[in-house]
UniProtKB/Swiss-Prot annotation:
This is DNA-directed RNA polymerase subunit alpha. Keywords: DNA-directed RNA polymerase, Nucleotidyltransferase, Transcription, Transferase. DNA-dependent RNA polymerase catalyzes the transcription of DNA into RNA using the four ribonucleoside triphosphates as substrates. It comes from the Bacteria. It comes from Bartonella henselae (strain ATCC 49882 / DSM 28221 / CCUG 30454 / Houston 1) (Rochalimaea henselae). Residues 1-233 are annotated as: Alpha N-terminal domain (alpha-NTD). The gene is rpoA. Its EC number is 2.7.7.6.
């Protein structure tokens, strides 16, 4: 059946987020993944994170008394070119769509920082200590900024405004809230299989969004883009009611115990005790299992943990087990578990 193409691939059962000393850096560990999927997912998520998340940035600046970026300002130590470079590093968060205008005024002596800018609405300066310029005694500066929302990197020549007033200087804009993304793929173990992938993604942002949300947005973008390629309807699964009308027990009991990926010792003990199906296993009590030759407490805990993941436990009663046509039923319901 076609759904086996994706249903029988192993899916991650562990997603762990970890924080760093820098609150803008976070990591996520995902495991286990099918071999090769760590590289596939890591590279796709990295590219989307760096290119496609929206943010806010300054697109143009007007400095009183300045006509172009190759000017200098009396009493200001930095020239306009250096000031513009510093302006490009201002990190902003703005939930509403732009453009918006913000203003800053400063008298010397002193340092003009990003936190001195008067914001409007829901706008927030994320690096208020960032230095824009340094003013000497009796120096004064007034700047007006245009802030907009977008994605990716936009060069200054694309931020030019038609019929803009003289002195409005366009600025390169880095809208992306993501500063850096790296990933690492390692081998991990699932049951007796040792060559699954473990993906570790590390995301550094400017503070406008946390790493966990950024990953969620990137995954949603990929999901939306890939949906175009799905040219079929999801095959219908038999409902629980339909299954129960034909079976007097959970279809998962028809699964063979050698598919549970138990340790070699546990699997051999079950085999030696003629336990073939999960339905055979769950009717055993803990004391009965411990009386099995070479079967110890460690194997018991392993089996209890596996059964718990399936919503089952030892010592269950199934009056209609085993069914007469158990082999035929096992083949019929194999896609449901």
């Amino acid at each position: 059946m076609i759904q086996k193409n994706w249903q029988e691939l192993i899916k991650p059962n562990k997603v762990e987020f970890s924080k760093h000393d820098n609150p803008n850096i976070s990591s996520v560990i995902v495991e286990p993944l099918e071999r090769g999927f760590g590289l596939t997912l890591g590279n796709a998520l990295r590219r989307v994170l760096l290119s496609s998340l929206r943010g806010a940035a300054i697109t143009a600046v007007q400095i009183d008394g300045v006509l172009h970026e190759f000017s200098s300002i009396p009493g200001v130590r930095e020239d306009v070119t250096d000031i513009i470079l510093n302006i490009k590093e201002i990190a902003l968060r703005m939930r509403e769509e732009g453009p918006k205008r913000i203003v800053v005024c400063k008298e010397g002596p002193g340092v003009l920082r990003a936190g001195d800018i008067s914001t409007v609405g829901d706008m927030e300066i994320l690096n208020p200590d960032h230095v824009i310029c340094t003013l000497d005694e009796d120096a004064e500066i007034r700047m007006e900024f245009i802030v907009n929302t977008g994605k990716g990197y936009v060069p200054s020549d694309r931020n030019c405004i038609d019929d803009a007033r003289i002195g409005l200087i366009p600025v390169d804009s880095l809208y992306s809230p993501i500063r850096k993304v790296s990933y690492k793929v390692e081998n991990t173990r699932e049951g007796q299989v040792l060559d699954y992938d473990k993906l570790t993604l590390t995301v550094e942002t400017n503070g406008a969004v946390n790493g966990e949300d950024a990953l969620a947005f990137a995954a949603r973008i990929l999901q939306d883009q890939l949906a175009l390629f799905i040219n079929f309807k999801e095959p219908e699964k038999p409902t629980v009611e339909e299954s129960n009308s034909e079976l007097a027990f959970n279809p998962a009991l028809l699964k063979k115990v050698d598919e549970l990926e138990l340790s070699v010792r546990s699997a051999n003990c079950l085999k030696n005790d003629n336990i073939v199906y999960i339905g055979d296993l769950i009717q055993k009590t803990e004391s009965e299992m411990l009386r099995t030759p070479n079967f110890g407490r460690k194997s018991l805990n392993e089996i209890k943990e596996v059964l718990a993941c399936m919503g089952l436990h030892l010592g269950m009663e199934v009056p209609t087990w085993p069914p007469e046509n158990i082999d035929d039923l096992a083949k019929r319901y194999e896609d449901q578990y």
